Amino acid sequence: MKITTKVLIIGSGPAGLSAAIYTARAALKPILINGMQPGGQLTITTDVENYPGFAETVQGPWLMEQMYMQAKNVGTEIVSDYVEKVDLSKRPFKVFTGAGNEYDAESIIICTGAEAKWLGIASEQKFRGFGVSACATCDGFFFKNQEIVVVGGGNSAVEEALYLTNHANKVTIVHRRDSFRAEKILQDRLFKNSKISVIWDHVVDEIVGSNKPKSVTGVKIQNVHTKEISLLNCSGVFIAIGHAPNTGLFTGQIVMDDDNYIITKSGTTRTSVEGVFAAGDVQDKIYRQAVTAAGTGCMAALEAEKFLNK
């Protein structure tokens, strides 16, 4: 089936739903395709304490449900489907979905987000949200005066470790190589911090913990040379081996940086294609917060409205 719309929003995290709320209130009758993971990364986040407007801790899935209902109540058409292919060569832009529909859109707001890269071991999945995290800013507070392990060796790992010293008693970085890839200035700060220690030439073999209540108690790490396995006690494990934006759909059609994040014009959400906007983590490799994603979703909506009214 072919469907036409003034505004098509791809993605249903804080950026996409914020864009939907604003475009719906502007009477643009947006259609939002919610994607393979409706609600985005917050749907796998347990406690949220840093989203403005809530004096008490809220659950990530609950917060996304509220945004979803708000977007729907103001007139957004939300479609349970996912995008398989796009054609941004001319307007109206064409978007093809898994359900076999074709959407012809006068403007598109891309909110497909980014995903943390994970180790890919079963125990990591088991304890995700119960001691295993990929966001120190989001979850560091829960490990006050505890011992934490950070996995990685680039800028992300060093920055996460430095941040976590604001909360933890001790932070141990486990890195598979014998040196960091992080910037020299970050390494200097790390080595001067008495709360941080480094275990070189090791990888995480298994994350261990308790089921009642579900919580992390340590990690088994393996020496990459000797294959010897040892146990490192900790209460939390932060995976910091990078993020990957969900931009594969747009390769070759829109300008991206070397890490495949969509490039937007400074201070805006405008992309290299007129009429196509990008909001949230898909164009933000620095902050990656729910509140900043929602903010750029609002920006994209206002810019799309202005574009359509030209």
From Swiss-Prot:
<dbReference type="GO" id="GO:0004791">
    <property type="term" value="F:thioredoxin-disulfide reductase (NADPH) activity"/>
</dbReference>
<dbReference type="GO" id="GO:0005737">
    <property type="term" value="C:cytoplasm"/>
</dbReference>
<dbReference type="InterPro" id="IPR008255">
    <property type="entry name" value="Pyr_nucl-diS_OxRdtase_2_AS"/>
</dbReference>
<dbReference type="InterPro" id="IPR005982">
    <property type="entry name" value="Thioredox_Rdtase"/>
</dbReference>
<dbReference type="InterPro" id="IPR036188">
    <property type="entry name" value="FAD/NAD-bd_sf"/>
</dbReference>
<comment type="subunit">
    <text>Homodimer.</text>
</comment>
<keyword id="KW-0521">NADP</keyword>
<keyword id="KW-0560">Oxidoreductase</keyword>
<protein>
    <recommendedName>
        <fullName>Thioredoxin reductase</fullName>
        <ecNumber>1.8.1.9</ecNumber>
    </recommendedName>
</protein>
<dbReference type="InterPro" id="IPR050097">
    <property type="entry name" value="Ferredoxin-NADP_redctase_2"/>
</dbReference>
<comment type="similarity">
    <text>Belongs to the class-II pyridine nucleotide-disulfide oxidoreductase family.</text>
</comment>
<feature type="binding site">
    <location>
        <begin position="34"/>
        <end position="41"/>
    </location>
    <ligand>
        <name>FAD</name>
    </ligand>
</feature>
<feature type="binding site">
    <location>
        <begin position="281"/>
        <end position="290"/>
    </location>
    <ligand>
        <name>FAD</name>
    </ligand>
</feature>
<dbReference type="InterPro" id="IPR023753">
    <property type="entry name" value="FAD/NAD-binding_dom"/>
</dbReference>
<keyword id="KW-1015">Disulfide bond</keyword>
<keyword id="KW-0285">Flavoprotein</keyword>
<keyword id="KW-0274">FAD</keyword>
<feature type="disulfide bond" description="Redox-active">
    <location>
        <begin position="135"/>
        <end position="138"/>
    </location>
</feature>
<keyword id="KW-0676">Redox-active center</keyword>
<dbReference type="GO" id="GO:0019430">
    <property type="term" value="P:removal of superoxide radicals"/>
</dbReference>
<keyword id="KW-0963">Cytoplasm</keyword>
<dbReference type="Pfam" id="PF07992">
    <property type="entry name" value="Pyr_redox_2"/>
</dbReference>
